[in-house]
Amino acid sequence: MFYHPFLSILCITGSNESALYPFLRYLHTMPHVKLNVKPSLPRDLSPYQVVITTGCALSEQNDVELEQFVTAGGGWLALLHKPNANASDLLGVKIGEPGPVCELRIIFQNNSHPMARRLPDAVYITNPHRPLNKISDDAETILYADWHYQHSPMLVTRRAGKGSIACTTLQAYDNHSLQRILYRCLLHLSGRSDNDRMHGVGILGYAPSVGKLHGLGIGATPGLSLAAICDLSAERRAQAREDFPDARILHTAEALAEDPQVDLIIIATPPNTHARLCLQMMAAGKHVVCEKPLALTRQETDAMCDMADKKQVHLSCHQNRRFDVDYRAIQQALNEGLIGDLFYMETFVGGFKHPCGYWHSHEPISGGTAYDWGGHYIDWIVSLFPDRARTVIGTRHKRIWHDVTNADQERVQIRFAGGQEAEFMHSDIAAFRKPKWYLLGTEGAIIGCWRHELVYELDPVLYYHDKNIPRTELTPDLTLFRRHHSGQIIEQKLALPPRQDFLFHRNLADHLLTGEPLVAPLEQSVRVVAILEAAARSALNGGTVEVLDA
C-alpha cells in the first residue's frame, strides 16, 4: 500500500478539552499521523515535528523550550480558543476582544497558497469573532474573516529560525473544512506541503461513459495532469485524441505501464478485466484507481491488495457516487442524529425496460445484474452502517429478457453484526418503482422517491422536442420523518448540500498529495466485492444464507 511519510505530533491539552476531540479523531483516521496527547509540555521535544498547544497557560520555561524547538526546525500550532487565552510574543500577534458567536465567512488571504489547493474559495464556520492583531512584520495572514467590511485575521503564521509557528482563534473543531485546514497547517509547519507537485495520470480504457469524465476531472484538479490515454479500439483512440489533444494516445497496456510520465493509472475497462489489469499496472510500480466494482471475487481483491502492499503503491476504487447529493444529504442527516440509530435500509434501482446491448447485460463480463449498479448501492450501504456485514442472501428471477445473460431481477439482503438489516434490489421487470431510499432509524425515517424530468428543446417546425433525464442522474425527493412527543409524525424536506463537480478526483489528489483520508477507503470497496460474490453464490444455490468472514 502507498505509505505517506510519518507526521509526528504532540498535543498539549487538558482533560476538559472535549471540544477538541473531533479534530483529534480526524487526525487518528490517517495512519501516517502519529499523535501523542499529553497534559503538559515534556522536556524532550525531539521525537516530534509539530507541537499543538490549546490555550492552556504556558510557563516562561515552556515558552523558552518551544522557542528553542521552533528555531531548531520544529513547528508550533497554537489553538487560542479559550476565552482567557493569551498569545505568546513568539506568535507575533495579540488576541483581540471576543465578539459574538455567529456564522463567519472564512477566506484564504492567498488562494494559491499550498494550504488552499482544492479547497473551496470560502468556508462558513460558526465561531466567536476574535481577531488576531499582528504585531510582528513577518506575520502572514493565512485565513481571514469578513468582518464589518474588513479582513479580520483568524489564522496567522510566521517563521522563527528554521521552523514555523501558526495560531488561530477558530474553534469549530467538528467542522470538516476546518479539520482539513488545520491538518494542512500541521503539514505546512512540518515543512511539507504539496506545493506544485503533480501526478501524471493515464486512463486505461476510453469508455464512452467514463473516459471523458475522467479526463475532464483530471484537468479540473490541481495536482493531477492527464498524461496518456490507452485503448485497443482505433475509433476510441481517435475520440480521445479529439477530446484531449495534449495527451499521448497509446494502444497497448504495456506501453502505458512503461510510460515514465505516468504515475497513476485509472482503469476504465469491463469488470472481468479489472483484477488482471490492476495487477499488471501495480507490478510496473504505478498507482491505480479502478472502476467499480473493484473486482469480481474476494480472491481477486486479496491478490490486488497484496500487490499494492508489495509494490507500496496506491490502490482504490472509483466510488464516485459517494459524492452524489442525495447520499451526502443522508450521510449528513445520520451524522447529525436526525433519525437516531439506523437499523433498516432498502435501496432500489430499475424499471420495466429492455436491458442494454452492452457488456453490462452479459454476466461473464459484468459479473451479473447486482454487480453493475450494486457496485454503487452496496457501497452506500457499507458506508452507512458502522458494523461489518455478517450474512448475505441473494435471490434472482429470469422470466422476461432471455436474450441477455443477466438476471431480470436480483435482490441482495445483508445482515450486520449489530443486527441491522439492509437490502438492495435491481429490477428490469418492475412496472412500478420502489423508492430509491427507505431508511428507518430509532427516531425517524428518510424516504427518497425517484423524480421524472423532461427537458424541452424548441423546434421552429415541430415546435419542440422532449428528452428524458435519466432518473439515476436526478437527485430524488428526500423527505425526513420524525415522531413528535405528541405522537404525531412530522415530515420535512431534507437539507441538500450543493452539487459540485469532480469531487472524487479532488479527494484522490488530496489523499495522494497530502495524505488526507479517502472518502471511499479501499477496505470498504473490498467488502462490497465480498458481499456481491456471496450474494451471487447464494442466488446460484437457491437463496442460501452465506456467512462472511470477520
What do the PLM-derived regions correspond to, one by one?
Residues M1-M30, D194-F244:
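N-terminal Rossmann-like dinucleotide-binding module
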Residues H4-F6, Y26, M30, N133-D194:
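A glycine-centered loop/beta-turn motif at secondary-structure junctions
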Residues H28-L45:
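A short, well-structured beta->alpha microelement
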Residues A57-V123, L178:
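A glycine-rich, often tryptophan-bearing local segment used as a flexible ligand/cofactor-contacting loop or short
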Residues E60-D63, H214, F244, R248-M307:
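Beta-loop-alpha module in the N-terminal Rossmann-like domain of NAD(P)-dependent dehydrogenases
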Residues M198, N320, E443-V519, E523, ...:
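C-terminal glycine/acidic-rich active-site capping loop/insertion
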Residues S209, R321-V404, E410, G542:
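Predominantly a Rossmann-like dinucleotide-binding segment in NAD(P)-dependent oxidoreductases
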Residues A303-N320, D341-T347:
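Rossmann-fold dehydrogenase core element
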